[in-house]
C-alpha cells in the first residue's frame, strides 16, 4: 500500500438505513481523534461507567443546554487501532426513525472538530490505516448491496481475503519472473543462463489463471446484478398474467381489455441464487391513446437495456401479422425467447396457425400462465441462460473495476508473448511484465494513488 498522509479530522455519519416509522434501532458512527471527547460532551452517562475501549455504555444524548434529552442510547467505544477504521471510533445506537438520528447527528456536527463523512470514507480510512485491504473494503460494499444469498456468499469470501490472496499470489509469480530477467540483464556474466522456456511457460500458466478469474467474474456478474427480462408482445396476450405467475404476486392488473398495462412494472425472483427481474411492458401496437403511447415509448427503451426479451403471443389464436411486426421491431442484439401462451385454450387448429419457422425455433416455450403448465420449461430456459449451474463452486468473483484491471493484465501478458515470438532482447520482456505487475497492484490496492482511492470509495454508501 502506498503511504498517504494520515487523516487528522474527525468524521461522523449515520451508519444504518433510516426510513420514517421503520427500523427499531439506528446507529451514528464517529471516527477520529476527537470521537470520544465529542461523545462525552453530548451524552449523560449515569453512575460510574468506564469509557475504556470495547465497552458499552448506557446514557442519554442531550440538547445543547443539557436540560433536555434527545434520546436514550447505547454508546460503543472502540479505541484505535483496534477499531474498524484504525482510529478512535464511537458508535451511538439510538431508536430508529428519521428525527432522533438526525438530531443526534446534528448535535455531533455542531462541534468544529467534526465534519460529515464523505461516501465510503470510513472504509477508506480502514484501508489507509491497514485495517482492511482494498478488495476487502469493496467486498463489504458488495455484501451491503447483495440481492441474493450467493452474492452475499461471494462477498463474504472477499471480506475473508480470498480475492486479495489469489491476486497477490499471481502478482508474486510475475515479480519472480521479472526478478529473474532483470538479474540476467544486470549480472549476466555472474549467473546461470536464463531458462527462457520456463519463463514463457510460467507466463502462459499465469495468463490461464487470470482468464479463469475473468470467466468467474462474468458468471459472478449474474449473481451480483441479476438478469433483466423484458416481457414484450401485443396487448392481451398474457404478459401481465405470466409476470404474476412467475413472481407469485398480483403485480399487474389482468383484464380482457387490450392496453391495460400502460406503465413499466417490475417483479423480482431469485433462481438458484441469481436475481431475475421481470419487466412487464406495455403492449406494442398502433394506438391513438396518449397515455398508452407514452407506455409504448418506455417499452422500446426498456427492451434496448434488457438482458433477455421474452416475446409472448397467444398460442391458441396463432401467430399473427401483428406478432411478426413486433418481432421485427425488437433489438437484434438482445437474446430472444418466444413464448406461446394460453396453451390451455388451444385446439386442433391452434398448431396449424403457427408458422413452422416459429415452431422449429430452439428458443420457443409453450405454456399457460393461467394453469402453470409449461412454467418449468421457462424456468429451465432461464436457468440455462443465467448459467446458474455454473455458479456452483464459484468462490470469488471480481467486480467491474477489478475485472477491467485483470483484463489489462492479460493484455500485457499477451504482448509479452509477441515479444517472445519476435525474439526481442530481455529488456523488452520487462516492459509489459512490469506493467502487468502494476495493474495487479492497483487491483489489490498495493499500487494506488490517493485520487484513485477517492474515486473508488465515492461509490460507497455514506456511513460505510
Swiss-Prot record:
Mg(2+) binds at residues 240, 261. GTP binds at residues 236-241, 255-261, 280-283. GO terms for molecular function: GTP binding; GTPase activity; metal ion binding. (6S)-5-formyl-5,6,7,8-tetrahydrofolate binds at residues 29, 91, 131, 464. Its cofactor is K(+). Its main location: cytoplasm. SUPFAM superfamilies: P-loop containing nucleoside triphosphate hydrolases. InterPro entries: G_TrmE (IPR031168), GTP-bd (IPR006073), GTP-bd_TrmE_N (IPR018948), GTPase_MnmE (IPR004520), MnmE_dom2 (IPR027368), MnmE_helical (IPR025867), P-loop_NTPase (IPR027417), Small_GTP-bd (IPR005225). CDD domains: trmE (cd04164), TrmE_N (cd14858). Homodimer. Heterotetramer of two MnmE and two MnmG subunits. Belongs to the TRAFAC class TrmE-Era-EngA-EngB-Septin-like GTPase superfamily. TrmE GTPase family. This is tRNA modification GTPase MnmE.
Amino acid at each position: 500500500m502506498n503511504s498517504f498522509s494520515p487523516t487528522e479530522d474527525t468524521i461522523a455519519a449515520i451508519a444504518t438505513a433510516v426510513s420514517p416509522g421503520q427500523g427499531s434501532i439506528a446507529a451514528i458512527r464517529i471516527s477520529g481523534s476527537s470521537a470520544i471527547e465529542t461523545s462525552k460532551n453530548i451524552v449523560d452517562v449515569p453512575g460510574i461507567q468506564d469509557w475504556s475501549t470495547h465497552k458499552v455504555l448506557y446514557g442519554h444524548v442531550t440538547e445543547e443546554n443539557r436540560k433536555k434529552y434527545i434520546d436514550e442510547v447505547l454508546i460503543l467505544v472502540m479505541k484505535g487501532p483496534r477499531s474498524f477504521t484504525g482510529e478512535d471510533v464511537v458508535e451511538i445506537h439510538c431508536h430508529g426513525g428519521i428525527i432522533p438520528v438526525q438530531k443526534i447527528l446534528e448535535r455531533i456536527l455542531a462541534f468544529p472538530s467534526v465534519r460529515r463523512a464523505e461516501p465510503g470514507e470510513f472504509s477508506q480510512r480502514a484501508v489507509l490505516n491497514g485495517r482492511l485491504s482494498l478488495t476487502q473494503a469493496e467486498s463489504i460494499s458488495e455484501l451491503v448491496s447483495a440481492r441474493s444469498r450467493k452474492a452475499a456468499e461471494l462477498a463474504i469470501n472477499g471480506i475473508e481475503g480470498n480475492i486479495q490472496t489469489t491476486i497477490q499470489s499471481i502478482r508474486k509469480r510475475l515479480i519472480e519472473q521479472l526478478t529473474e530477467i532483470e538479474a540476467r540483464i544486470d549480472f549476466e556474466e555472474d549467473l546461470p543462463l536464463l531458462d527462457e522456456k520456463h519463463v514463457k511457460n510460467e507466463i502462459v500458466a499465469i495468463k490461464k489463471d487470470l482468464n479463469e478469474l475473468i470467466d468467474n467474474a462474468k458468471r459472478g456478474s449474474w449473481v451480483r446484478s441479476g438478469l433483466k427480462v423484458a416481457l414484450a408482445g401485443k396487448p392481451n396476450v398474457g404478459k401481465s398474467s405470466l409476470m404474476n405467475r412467475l413472481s407469485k404476486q398480483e403485480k399487474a392488473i389482468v383484464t380482457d381489455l387490450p392496453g391495460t398495462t400502460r406503465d413499466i412494472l417490475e417483479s423480482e425472483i431469485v433462481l438458484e441464487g441469481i436475481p431475475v427481474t421481470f419487466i412487464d411492458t406495455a403492449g406494442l401496437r398502433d394506438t391513438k391513446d396518449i397515455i398508452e403511447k407514452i407506455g409504448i415509448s418506455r417499452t422500446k427503451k426498456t427492451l434496448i437495456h434488457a438482458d433477455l426479451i421474452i416475446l409472448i403471443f397467444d398460442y391458441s389464436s396463432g401467430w399473427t401479422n401483428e406478432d411478426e411486426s413486433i418481432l421485427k421491431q425488437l433489438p437484434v442484439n438482445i437474446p430472444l425467447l418466444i413464448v406461446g401462451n394460453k396453451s390451455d385454450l388451444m385446439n386442433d387448429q391452434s398448431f396449424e396457425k403457427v408458422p413452422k419457422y416459429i415452431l422449429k425455433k430452439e428458443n420457443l416455450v409453450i405454456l399457460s400462465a393461467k394453469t402453470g403448465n409449461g412454467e418449468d420449461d421457462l424456468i429451465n430456459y432461464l436457468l440455462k441462460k443465467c448459467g446458474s449451474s455454473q455458479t456452483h463452486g464459484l468462490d470469488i468473483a471480481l467486480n467491474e473495476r477489478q475485472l477491467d484491471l485483470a483484463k489489462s493484465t492479460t493484455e500485457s501478458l499477451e504482448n509479452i508473448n509477441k515479444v517472445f515470438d519476435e525474439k526481442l532482447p530481455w529488456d523488452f520482456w520487462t516492459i509489459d511484465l512490469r506493467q502487468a505487475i502494476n495493474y495487479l497492484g492497483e487491483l489489490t490496492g498495493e499500487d494506488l494513488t490517493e485520487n484513485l482511492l477517492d474515486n473508488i470509495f465515492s461509490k460507497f454508501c455514506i456511513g460505510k
